[in-house]
Every structure is written in structure tokens, then in C-alpha cells.
């Protein structure tokens, strides 16, 4: 609270009393009322068709058993024409007329058309291996083909799954490893076109249990959740891999041949690579199957526990199926009716605890939010909107910031702000009695030690000092030079800067220089957008409590100073793309609280009771740790007299309200009656029976009243004692400070110039829960946070008159979501498998038709002197590019030359010609003209080399040394 602004009226302030700071301290899908389809009804058609197989075979020449009805699902609520079926009498008798036979053929063609296939009759089928049976029982009397078993195994209609030209596999057979399951009503159609095969009861039948388990539950809005999308991706990949593996099974002769030495190298490479590819595919299938089961178990765990599929609903099914289910509901077994009655009874039965007057908590315990008393579970949705890091519902254009501190340990409440680029954190005290935002900077010799290091202005790429010549931004005095370092490499002493001086009612004072930079409320993880603010204060001097306090600076949220210098909140209110309402709220608890900019928190309010009554000192009041059931029964408590009380603001210098008086049990304070003073009580005494509530009245046209409970004006001290927060400030004006704000949500409406009060259950935040700043070494230990990844958005102040870029997106805290991490992991696994396959294919060597060559030495080297003539001849052969280090010819010839050199040492009159692969006894002199000639002693000591000796194993007459061409083929 600023000093020297006292008047006859009272005003609200966050300044405390004279006490100094001491040691710190799945959307549930709608359930259908109809009974769930019984597996007995689904298999009834199959058993009946199998039982009539002898009759159908006896009359094969004239007729065949009819196929089941096929419903084409083209859209929601559209009923399509069903294929004509055979009457029950004709089925039971086993005989049909010519007309019935014609209807049967038409039925099959209609069903085939629904499936998007071309039906072929018995006479046109020929010797095709693929069946075209459309009934559930497999009426052809032929064992299922490979294509049908492949479809049953893969669950995906893939072109690789069929060997014949016909596209309709057998959906179910007696030898199928997977029995058909009832297809859920309202679910998407099966894979074969847009149709499903139904049983006798009219229920669609699914060919796979896997397809039912993988069927996702769609959102009512039509948007699938991310986990459902991930499950669909896993199902698709698994199905494709299953199809590829079974496709390899269709061609065992081509892919399983053993290596043949007479075959060409390319065929051998293809055979080996195909076997390696099969092994890799099997390993990949196992991996994807494990991932699918793991992901599907978490998605469908709740569905498996329920006897009724959660997506069975008449409203979501096609009209034909819905009407059919309604008509045939009377034919359901009695057991299903009983189960349906139990489920309806459970839905109509009140929740456990409501019978006893209790309600359950609707917010998670870890969120720090307690449901407001007076609200029942039926009044609030069980599945609320998504919450943010503070456990509150996410709202657009609303900024939130944690408040830390307490009345006893700190005597103030503070929040964190991020300043500069890259951001640096500063802790600032929330003050409704001033309008200055300031904190110490690096180089301040008269500043104390605080929670965070002093801001280094030279590190900020977006900061700039405010010059005295800038009259539109400088409203203070001018400095003639300070010891602070400059922004952008310059010192502030080189020019005259805009300066500020601020004093407070408890005797503290600060002095510093203004600068402009970007500022964001809260921690980095909250991702509140930063804004450009031209009036950030940089301390050069601190006195009294500012030196010893833990918080670094001050954050004033009062009205602008002199109606010219806007506060940080005024800058945010000036742009509609940031906030919708010019309103902020403060909710303070025993330890910590919450600051909300752009609105208030309705979920934290305490709802009023059904009936209001006069105040009673015996009434119970909600305190910390009290159950919700006890709070709900408080129907006579004056704490719930009004949900929200508004009073007008009569002055814009501070938040001044027309306070008319305070009354305690009929006694008006300030009329000669002694106040409570610093009374101490025992912690075990019932406060509600000793200390009465205080009724605070405001002198506006509505005669607004707010109740001030002992939990607010009493605060805990050490040793189990309490002290009251009432004190005489020795001036004529009254101050409603922290003790009045406690356990209330105070709303400051700047548009309508009013202040609102409402009882609330404010969240608590302790200092050990405070995250670390952008620098890993800043602040106490806690959860690390990431700095800004992009430069902050520059938002001009209202006086600039410039436009504001809209739709600015803030950097995300995590680069990828959990669903994206799953997809990235799958892609990494696939990339590794592809790399292993390529390596295996490249490691397969092509065999040569010639005999084996001598292995290359580990470190091949020239067996002669560097400047000798043999070296010249050897280098000449290599220079033509015919021979290389990895060439077998080069390796073989080098090995032979070394063997000759070991037998007879190399001399000057013997040379090796690499191109001709032979030794010569004389020097042509056409390679190195400056070669040194060996001395006479060396010529005498060196033995002569004769290539024509019969005893030499490497004679020049041996033609085998010259048979190999240079290419090695």
C-alpha cells in the first residue's frame, strides 16, 4: 500500500500489519435399455443350418438353403432394402418351388451386391478354391479355403489375402479357429463393402472377436479420442503384417526352397533374403501384437468388465436394426429381462452416500481443489472439462498464477513472473494498494538476498532502458547516473534514465530505474503469453523489509498512477486477444492462493443454502479438513447468506469502498467498545463458540453485507496459539487487509468499477511445491521447467495505438504428446528392422565359378623398396585401375611375389611386371630413370635370380600364372 493516500473512506490493501517476516516455512457412453444380444441367439442360425444340411443336400439339384439377410448400412438412420428370404415353412420342409428357388438366387445375388462382390452360382463356380458362401453355416459342404482362413486370421480385407478373382471370403465355418461374435449395434460396418451378415434374429454378426475388441468408442461429437486413434493405427499395422505373413504361406514352394549350387547367384540371394524377411516379419508381428494388446487393454478395460457393450444404443444404430430390436425385445430370455431390470434399478437408485446426506468429491485429490460445499453430485457433471496444471478447468483468455506465502510465516503473498528473453524469474509481492512492478537487478549494492538471483539485464535480448526524453513513457524523475549495468552492452551512467521512488505504509522504500521488456505471469510450465511492458522497475536501493524479505520485488495491481502510467494488468486488459473481461480475482487460503486475470473461478465458490436465515454464532463453518457432508448440512449458517456480494468503488487512486461499519453480535466496532486486541486462545478451544463472526457492511445503495469469520481474522502462531488480524493503524481510514481476504474470492471488476466478495475454498500452494526457474540452479528444489523455445510475442501498450497480432501460439512444454511418442517408437522399431534387413542382404556374398582364392592379408603392403623399379612397375599396374586392394587377382599376385622373394631375395636385375604378371631379368628403363643403382658390393652379395630353373616352383614357363584375367571373372 502506498503511503500518503489516506482519506476518509476505507480501501482494500494487501499490506499487512506491523508484524515483520520471521523464519520462512471417458465419457461414459449411453447404455441401452434393450437387452444385450445373447450368443445363443447368434449361434442358433448356425446350428439350424448345420442341422438341415442333409435336407439341403438331398434337394441340391433343385434348390439350396437360403442365405441370411444382408443389411446395407449407408448412413445413420437410413433403412435399406433387405434381400428376399425364404419362409420358415420352406426351410423346415426342406423343399422349395421354382419361385422359391428364383427368390433364393435373387437373395444370393442381392447379398453379394451388398457385399460389393460378384456372386457366382454352383454351375459357374467350377474348380475355384475360393468359396462364395454368404451364409453363417457354410452351406456349400466344402471345407474352408485358404482365402477364408486368411480373412478370419487377419481381420482386414486386403488384396494380398485372396488367390482367386472373387472377393467374398467365407465369414464363418465350422473349422474356423475364431467363432463369430455378435456385432454391436451402432458400430461401423464390417470390411466387405458397407454391409454386415445378420443372424436369424436380425442382429449383425462379426467374423472376428478381434474386430469387436478393436472397435473404438466414438465421441458424441464425432471426434475420436487420441487413444482410440492410436488403437486403430495398431490394429491396421497388425492386420497388414498378418496378411503379409499369410501371403508368404500361400507360396511355400517359391519362398522355402533350399539353396541350389547350380542356380544363379541372384536366385540364391532372393531365396536367402526371403527367408530373412519372413523371420523379420514374424518378429515384427509379435511386437505389434504385444503393443496392440497392451494399448487395447487400457482402452477397453472398463468395457470388458461390463456385461453390456457400452456402445449398444438404439439411438446410434440404423433405423432398421433399432426397430427390429424393439419388435423382438419381447422374445428375449427372462434372464436378460432380469439383468436389464437390475441395471435400470442401479441407474435409478441414488448414489451411495446421498441417502445419508453425503456427496462424493468431484475433483481429484491431487489437484488441490476441493468441491464447494452445498453442491451435490447431481448438480455437477461427473466428467468435467479438461483441467490445467493447477487442477482447474481450462478456460480461454484467462491467466492463472500460483500465490505463495502466509499471514504468519511471510506476512504477505507473492507470485512468480518471467522477464526478458531468455526469461529470468523474479518473485514479487501481490499488492492491491500500489501500481508499481519492480525487483532488484544485478549490480545493486544496497539490495538484499532473495529467493531468486537478481535479474541480469544484459542477458535480455528484448530489454531497453527508458530515457528521460521519452515523455510518453517516463513519468518519474531523471537520474544522473547509477552503478547498474546497461541493457544491450551500454551503461546507464552514460545517459540520463527515467527513475522511480516508492514508499510504503510500514516504512519500507525502494528506488530504481525503469526499463522496457516482456513479462509473463506465473511459471514457465503454465505457458501464459508474455506481453511488452514499458514500466518495469529495476531496484538500485532497498530499505527495511525489502532487504530482509524472501520475495524479491513488488507487483502492484491497483489503478494506474496518475491515470497515465498503466500497470501490467492494464496492458493485458487493453487487448481483447489476451483477455475477454477487465476483471481479476484473488483467492487466498491459509498457505498460498490463486491469482486469476480475465475472470474468476466459479468452481471455487461456496454455494448458498436453499434457505437463508439470520446469523447464528453457534452455526458451523467450513474449515480446512472438514468433510463435505458436514458443510452441506449448514442451512442456517450466515456464511452462505449470499453467493456473491458486490460493492462500488468510490475512488480510483486505490480500491476504496464505502465501508459503513463492522458489527459483532449487535455491537458496532469503533463506537467506544474495546476491540479484540492481540487476544490469544488455546488451539483446542472451539472457535465457533467463543469468537463470533463479524458482519461488514458497505454504505452503497444495496447495503451490501459480508460475513467475516474467525477462520479469516484469526491466524495460527507457534505453540498452538492463535492471533487476530485486527489492529489500529493510527489513522482515520480503515484497511481491509490479508485477514479479510482469507477464505474469500475477491473480484475486482474494472469495467463496472465494483468489488465483489464470495466465500470460496481457495487452493493452497507451499514453497516446496514451487517449480524451479528457467535456470536449473535457480530457486529451491522442485520440478524442473523448460524455458521459452521461441521469442515472446511483443504486445504494444494501449498508448502506442498499434495493432496486436492475433492467434499467437505459445511454445509447448513437451515436444510430443504421449500418443505421438507411441507412433515415434513404432517408426523407430520399423526403421531398425528395415536396417537389419538391408544389412543381411548386403552381407550375402555372390559365389564365384572359379576355385577359391587365397584370403587377403590383414595389412597388405608392397614387398619392395619405395623408390625401386619394381615399385614403379607395380604402381603402374595399379594406376590403370585394373587392380585394387580388394581385388582377388591383386591379392593372389601379391602373395606369389612374397613367396618368390622369400625363396630368392629381390635384386636390381630382377623385376616384377604387374600388368603381365611375370618376372623379368632386365630393366627396361622406361619407368623410373632416376632410380639408384645398387653398389658393387650389393651386386656381389646378392644371389642371382633365375626364373628358368626347373627347381623353381614359379617358373616363367608356367602358363597357369597368366590364365586369370584382371577382372577376376
From Swiss-Prot:
Enzyme nomenclature, EC number: 3.4.23.-
Compartment(s) of residence: Golgi apparatus membrane
Keyword Iron: no
Residues annotated as catalytic: 431, 682
Transmembrane segments: 821-841
Pfam family, one: TAXi_C
Record topological domains on the Cytoplasmic side: 842-969
Leader peptide range in chain numbering: 1-22
Domain Peptidase A1: 413-758
Entry's Gene Ontology molecular function annotations: aspartic-type endopeptidase activity
Disruption phenotype: Knockout in type I (RH strain) or type II (Prugniaud strain) parasites, results in a reduction in tachyzoite growth; the lytic cycle is slower with some defects in spontaneous egress while intracellular replication in the host cell is normal. In tachyzoite infected host cells, association of host mitochondria (HMA) with the parasitophorous vacuole membrane (PVM) is reduced; however, does not affect processing and expression levels of MAF1, which is required for HMA. Up-regulation of several host cell genes induced during infection is reduced.
Functional summary from the UniProt entry: In tachyzoites, plays an essential role in the export of several dense granule proteins into the host cell by cleaving the localization motif RRLxx (termed Toxoplasma export element (TEXEL)) located downstream of the N-terminal secretory signal sequence. However, can also regulate the export of proteins that lack the TEXEL motif, such as GRA24. Requires Arg at P3 and P2, and Leu at P1 in the substrate TEXEL motif and, specifically, cleaves after Leu. Cleaves GRA16; proteolytic cleavage is essential for the correct trafficking of GRA16 from the parasite into the infected host nucleus.
Name of the protein this chain belongs to: Aspartic protease 5
Amino acid at each position: 500500500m502506498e503511503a500518503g493516500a489516506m482519506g476518509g473512506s476505507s480501501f482494500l490493501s494487501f499490506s499487512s500489519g506491523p508484524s515483520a517476516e520471521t523464519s520462512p516455512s471417458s465419457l461414459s457412453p449411453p447404455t441401452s435399455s434393450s437387452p444385450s444380444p445373447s450368443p445363443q441367439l447368434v449361434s442358433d442360425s448356425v446350428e439350424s443350418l448345420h442341422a438341415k444340411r442333409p435336407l439341403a443336400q438331398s434337394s441340391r439339384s433343385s434348390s439350396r438353403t437360403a442365405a441370411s439377410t444382408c443389411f446395407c448400412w449407408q448412413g445413420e438412420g437410413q433403412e435399406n432394402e433387405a434381400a428376399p428370404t425364404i419362409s420358415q415353412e420352406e426351410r423346415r420342409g426342406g423343399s422349395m418351388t421354382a419361385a422359391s428357388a428364383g427368390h433364393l438366387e435373387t437373395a444370393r445375388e442381392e447379398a453379394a451386391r451388398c457385399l460389393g462382390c460378384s456372386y457366382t452360382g454352383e454351375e459357374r463356380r467350377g474348380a475355384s478354391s475360393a468359396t462364395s458362401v454368404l451364409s453363417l453355416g457354410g452351406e456349400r459342404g466344402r471345407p474352408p479355403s485358404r482365402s477364408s482362413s486368411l480373412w478370419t486370421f487377419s481381420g482386414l480385407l486386403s488384396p494380398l489375402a485372396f488367390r482367386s478373382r472373387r472377393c467374398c471370403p467365407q465369414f464363418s465355418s465350422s473349422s474356423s479357429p475364431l467363432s463369430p461374435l455378435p456385432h454391436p449395434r451402432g458400430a461401423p460396418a464390417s470390411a466387405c463393402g458397407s454391409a454386415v451378415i445378420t443372424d436369424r434374429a436380425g442382429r449383425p454378426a462379426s467374423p472376428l472377436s478381434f474386430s469387436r475388441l478393436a472397435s473404438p468408442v466414438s465421441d458424441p461429437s464425432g471426434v475420436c479420442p487420441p487413444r482410440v486413434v492410436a488403437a486403430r493405427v495398431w490394429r491396421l499395422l497388425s492386420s497388414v503384417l498378418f496378411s503379409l505373413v499369410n501371403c508368404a504361406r500361400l507360396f511355400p514352394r517359391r519362398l522355402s526352397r533350399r539353396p541350389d549350387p547350380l542356380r544363379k547367384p541372384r536366385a540364391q540371394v532372393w531365396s536367402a533374403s526371403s527367408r530373412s524377411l519372413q523371420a523379420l516379419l514374424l518378429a515384427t508381428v509379435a511386437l505389434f501384437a504385444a503393443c496392440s494388446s497392451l494399448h487395447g487393454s487400457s482402452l477397453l478395460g472398463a468395457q470388458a468388465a461390463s456385461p453390456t457393450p457400452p456402445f449398444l444404443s438404439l439411438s446410434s444404430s440404423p433405423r432398421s436394426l433399432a426397430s427390429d430390436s424393439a419388435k423382438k425385445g419381447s422374445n428375449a430370455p427372462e434372464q436378460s429381462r432380469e439383468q436389464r431390470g437390475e441395471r435400470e434399478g442401479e441407474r435409478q437408485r441414488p448414489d451411495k452416500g446421498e441417502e445419508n446426506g453425503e456427496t462424493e468429491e468431484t475433483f481429484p485429490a491431487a489437484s488441490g481443489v476441493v468441491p464447494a460445499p452445498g453442491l451435490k453430485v447431481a448438480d455437477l457433471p461427473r466428467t468435467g472439462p479438461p483441467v490445467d496444471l493447477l487442477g482447474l478447468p481450462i478456460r480461454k483468455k484467462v491467466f492463472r498464477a500460483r500465490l505463495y506465502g502466509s499471514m504468519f510465516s511471510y506476512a504477505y503473498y507473492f507470485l512468480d513472473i518471467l522477464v526478458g528473453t531468455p526469461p529470468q524469474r523474479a518473485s514479487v509481492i501481490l499488492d492491491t494498494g500500489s501500481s508499481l512492478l519492480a525487483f532488484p537487478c544485478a549490480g545493486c549494492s544496497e539490495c538484499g538476498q532473495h529467493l531468486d538471483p537478481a535479474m541480469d539485464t544484459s542477458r535480455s535480448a528484448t530489454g531497453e532502458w527508458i530515457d528521460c526524453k521519452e515523455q510518453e513513457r517516463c513519468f518519474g524523475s531523471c537520474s544522473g547516473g547509477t552503478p547498474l549495468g546497461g541493457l544491450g552492452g551500454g551503461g546507464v551512467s552514460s545517459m540520463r534514465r527515467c527513475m522511480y521512488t516508492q514508499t510504503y505504509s510500514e516504512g519500507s522504500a525502494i528506488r530504481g530505474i525503469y526499463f522496457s521488456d516482456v513479462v509473463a505471469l506465473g511459471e514457465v510450465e503454465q505457458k501464459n503469453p508474455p506481453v511488452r511492458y514499458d514500466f518495469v522497475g529495476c531496484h538500485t536501493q532497498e530499505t527495511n523489509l525489502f532487504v530482509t524479505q524472501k520475495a524479491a520485488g513488488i507487483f502492484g495491481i491497483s489503478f494506474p498512477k496518475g491515470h497515465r502510467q498503466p500497470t501490467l494488468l492494464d496492458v493485458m486488459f487493453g487487448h481483447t486477444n489476451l483477455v475477454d473481461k477487465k476483471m481479476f480475482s484473488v483467492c487466498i487460503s491459509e498457505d498460498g492462493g490463486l491469482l486469476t486475470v480475465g475472470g474468476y473461478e466459479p468452481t471455487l465458490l461456496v454455494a448458498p443454502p436453499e434457505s437463508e436465515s439470520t446469523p447464528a454464532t453457534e452455526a458451523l463453518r467450513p474449515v480446512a479438513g472438514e468433510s463435505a457432508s458436514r458443510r452441506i448440512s449448514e442451512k442456517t449458517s450466515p456464511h452462505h447468506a449470499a453467493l456473491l456480494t458486490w460493492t462500488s468503488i468510490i475512488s480510483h487512486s486505490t480500491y476504496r469502498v464505502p465501508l459503513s461499519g463492522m458489527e459483532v453480535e449487535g455491537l458496532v466496532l469503533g463506537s467506544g467498545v474495546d476491540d479484540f486486541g492481540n487476544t490469544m486462545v488455546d488451539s483446542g478451544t472451539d472457535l465457533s463458540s467463543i469468537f463470533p463472526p463479524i458482519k461488514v457492511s458497505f454504505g452503497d445503495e444495496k447495503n451490501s453485507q459480508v460475513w467475516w469469520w474467525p477462520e479469516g481474522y484469526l491466524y495460527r502462531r507457534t505453540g498452538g496459539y492463535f492471533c487476530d488480524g485486527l489492529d489500529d493503524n493510527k489513522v482515520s481510514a480503515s484497511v481491509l487487509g490479508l485477514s479479510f481476504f482469507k477464505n474469500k474470492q475477491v473480484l475486482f471488476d474494472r469495467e463496472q468499477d465494483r468489488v465483489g466478495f464470495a466465500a470460496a475454498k481457495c487452493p493452497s500452494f507451499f514453497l516446496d511445491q514451487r517449480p524451479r526457474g528457467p535456470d536449473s540452479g535457480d530457486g529451491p528444489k522442485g520440478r524442473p521447467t523448460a524455458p521459452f523455445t521461441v521469442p515472446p510475442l511483443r504486445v504494444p501498450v494501449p498508448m502506442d495505438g498499434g495493432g496486436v497480432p492475433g492467434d499467437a501460439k505459445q511454445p509447448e512444454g513437451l515436444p510430443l504428446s504421449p500418443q505421438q511418442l507411441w507412433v515415434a517408437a513404432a517408426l523407430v522399431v520399423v526403421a531398425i528392422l528395415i536396417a537389419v534387413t538391408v544389412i543381411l542382404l548386403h552381407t550375402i556374398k555372390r559365389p564365384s565359378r572359379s576355385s577359391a582364392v587365397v584370403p587377403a592379408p590383414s595389412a597388405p603392403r608392397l614387398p619392395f623398396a619405395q623408390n625401386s623399379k619394381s615399385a614403379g612397375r607395380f604402381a603402374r599396374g595399379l594406376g590403370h585401375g585394373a587392380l585394387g586392394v580388394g581385388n582377388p587377382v591383386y591379392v593372389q599376385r601379391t602373395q606369389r611375389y612374397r613367396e618368390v622373394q622369400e625363396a630368392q631375395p629381390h635384386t636390381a636385375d630382377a623385376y616384377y611386371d604387374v600388368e603381365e604378371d611375370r618376372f623379368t631379368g632386365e630393366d627396361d628403363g622406361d619407368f623410373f630413370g632416376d632410380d639408384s643403382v645398387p653398389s658393387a658390393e650389393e651386386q656381389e652379395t646378392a644371389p642371382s635370380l633365375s626364373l628358368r630353373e626347373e627347381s623353381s616352383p614359379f617358373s616363367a614357363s608356367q602358363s597357369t600364372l597368366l590364365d586369370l584375367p584382371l577382372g577376376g571373372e
